[in-house]
Amino acid sequence: MAVGALIRLAFHKHAVDRSRALQKHVPANVTAVRDLHYGGADAFLDVFYPSEHQNDERLLPAIVWIHGGAFVGGDKSDVASYLEILAGRGYTAIGINYSLAPGARYPAPVIQANQALSFLNAYADRLHVDPRRLFLAGDSAGAQIASQLAAAVVDPSYAESLGISPAVEPAQIEGVALFCGVYDVSQIDRRGSFGRVLETVVWSYFGRRDVTADPRLAEFSVIRHVTQEFPPAFISAGNADPLAPQSVAVADAIRAHGVAVTEVFFPPDYTRALPHEYQFDLDGANGRRTLERLTTWLDERARAGGSEGAPHR
């Protein structure tokens, strides 16, 4: 079996276990609309919103979440339970699928995520989406994709380099929530087993084994494209996540441009080692606290961005 397939299988097993563990935390008062087709063959999205609005036309601040999976795996179903939990707190939460590597190459997922925003703009009234109050979010590879899309929305030259005509205006993006992503490949330690996995992932996504001289790698590394127009950010990673330095670095870069950053990080000697994607562990106190921090941040941003204020709970 190819290494990429092994990575995909490992992510799938972990995601299934994680989703099963999250089920007990999912509220009953959430309505789901699944598998809406927003574009090409792999372009489907799920929408979750509070059931109390099933028969009304209330528009809610919307969280557009892009799943992880190292660009070669993952599915919107992996984050569905977490999105249902967020929807139960007064939001419309959307999980999107995108085409995976090696079948789809960079920057196809970023382009598809932009298409999803176009779809949500067009059908906002039917899906309880307030298009004036959108949040981009993602975990792992999805965080990287979300960060690139956020940068493209606010920077026309960056959007042009990606081949994107942004589907939304900068003012529509209230913020971006990024968990355990990659934001500057040049700063990742490629030694050991993790380095070998990274090389396989990059090879699959970019279509060439050695991408060190590929100008697209600098484009991919969104930390180099942050400007003062970048949306306010919520950023977190676990202390035992090998990608945690990436989150710290991008938080510093965003803040250096005068943009508000809310971060949840943990010291290296923290009493518990928190792994990649720790935020989905709601059986643990740290995952629960981060969910509360995220919800508070979302509420504050939603209140600042819309006349209807924060969601009612």
Model regions and ranges:
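Alpha/beta-hydrolase superfamily serine-hydrolase fold, recognizing
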Residues: M1-R313
